[in-house]
């Protein structure tokens, strides 16, 4: 990134921010869809039952922990690949 001029650096930063936002929105959408599908079964009321609320809390926590673990594994893999290239 050092070889880019200030304008190019700014454009590159905007691209990175856009991609990060897009990735976050995809993660959020997947979370909502999955937990809603798995947990919400009763459409006779406009409110969630306590069972549905508990299910959604557990589902979202599990989903986010899984996503975090996957991200960490990718970081570890990238670090290992970087070390292998540095030799």
Swiss-Prot record:
It is a peripheral membrane protein. GO terms for biological process: protein transport. One of its GO terms (cellular component) is mitochondrial inner membrane. Pfam families: zf-Tim10_DDP. Keywords: Chaperone, Disulfide bond, Membrane, Metal-binding, Mitochondrion, Mitochondrion inner membrane, Protein transport, Translocation, Transport, Zinc. A motif (Twin CX3C motif) lies at residues 35-59. Disulfide bonds join 35-59, 39-55. It comes from the Eukaryota. The twin CX3C motif contains 4 conserved Cys residues that form 2 disulfide bonds in the mitochondrial intermembrane space. However, during the transit of TIM9 from cytoplasm into mitochondrion, the Cys residues probably coordinate zinc, thereby preventing folding and allowing its transfer across mitochondrial outer membrane. Belongs to the small Tim family. Heterohexamer; composed of 3 copies of TIM9 and 3 copies of TIM10, named soluble 70 kDa complex. Associates with the TIM22 complex, whose core is composed of TIM22 and TIM54. Interacts with the transmembrane regions of multi-pass transmembrane proteins in transit. This is Mitochondrial import inner membrane translocase subunit Tim9. It comes from Zygosaccharomyces bailii. The lineage of its organism: Eukaryota, Fungi, Dikarya, Ascomycota, Saccharomycotina.
